[in-house]
Swiss-Prot record:
Record-linked InterPro entries: UreD
Assembly, per entry: UreD, UreF and UreG form a complex that acts as a GTP-hydrolysis-dependent molecular chaperone, activating the urease apoprotein by helping to assemble the nickel containing metallocenter of UreC. The UreE protein probably delivers the nickel.
Main function: Required for maturation of urease via the functional incorporation of the urease nickel metallocenter.
Species of the source: Polaromonas sp. (strain JS666 / ATCC BAA-500)
Pfam families: UreD
Places the protein is found: Cytoplasm
Segments crossing the lipid bilayer: none
Protein's name in the database: Urease accessory protein UreD
Matching PANTHER family: UREASE ACCESSORY PROTEIN D
Length: 276
């Protein structure tokens, strides 16, 4: 039996408060809206009761924010891509921001179990004046549990249409990619954090985003396998390779909190669900 599910969540600004409205079909839900930072920022948690995807499953997620709205979206646990008998498992996410909107897209990691055929697509469309901070974290197998990513494949697609496009296909059988110093060098966690603007960042702001990230990276144990770049005037990216998820997640959280403080004047405030 396969699961197909859709979830659409729209953030609007009403009398100084960001309000979330959602629609769903199948096993996808949004938990109660939370306001730990005040009415201006709405925190939401995506829940997928089946707990993972197998071959043939499809999840479609659509999130939007209107002018002046600020939404933060996360998950209570990892997205799990389990073994497939032939059909791929697909997750598609589309984030759409109107002018003046802000969004933080912070799901916990996706875990690719051995034998999976997984695809994870993320598309971000921003109007001029909109800004987004998000990340994408993928674990290949569970090395700490002696469950390696021995066979299977994972396809990743991250795009800001007309601005930035990254595609990757990771096959467990590709020993050069998985083990070569020019590839993943034996690491099993691949992670990216991105700051995306709907129009070009001015030079000072863009450089400050890079400098802030690089200072944090230099002081972190993963400094040899992490870096910050700006592939386009609207995008700044931090990339990390790590043996397991936890150190990569810790590094990205530090940069995320620094960026939201420097550029949005928002105090450090991690989603409560992460501490449960």
């Amino acid at each position: 039996m396969t699961w197909n599910a859709t979830l659409a969540l729209d953030y609007t600004r009403q009398a100084g408060k960001t309000v979330a409205h959602f629609r769903h079909s199948g096993p996808l839900r949004i938990l109660q809206s939370l306001y730990p930072e005040g009415d201006a920022i709405c925190h939401n948690v995506i829940v997928h009761p089946p707990g993972g995807l197998v071959g043939g499953d499809t999840l479609d997620l659509q999130f939007s924010a209107s002018a002046g709205a600020h939404g933060l979206i996360t998950t209570p646990g990892a997205t799990r891509f389990y073994r497939s008998t032939g059909e791929p498992a697909l997750q598609r996410t589309h984030l759409t921001l109107e002018a003046g909107a802000r969004m933080e897209w912070l799901p916990l990691e996706a875990i690719c179990y051995s034998g999976c055929l997984a695809e994870n697509h993320l598309t971000m469309t921003l109007a001029p004046g909109a800004e987004l901070i998000g990340w994408d974290i993928t674990a290949l197998g569970l090395p700490a549990a002696s469950l390696p990513f021995a066979h299977g494949s994972f396809c990743q697609h991250i795009e800001v249409p007309g601005v930035w496009l990254e595609r990757a296909r990771i096959q467990a059988s590709d020993t050069l990619l998985m083990s070569s110093p020019l590839g993943m060098a034996g690491h099993r966690c691949v992670a990216s954090l991105f700051f995306v603007a709907g129009s070009k960042l001015d030079r000072h702001r863009r450089q400050q985003a890079l400098d802030t990230a690089r200072q944090i990276i230099e002081a972190h144990p993963l400094s040899a396998t992490a870096g910050a770049t700006s592939p386009d005037g609207q995008v700044v990216v931090v990339r990390v390779l790590a043996p397991v998820v936890e150190p990569a997640m810790a590094l990205l959280r530090q940069v995320w909190l620094a960026w939201r403080s420097h550029f949005w004047q928002q105090a450090a405030s991690s989603p409560r669900i992460w501490s449960m």
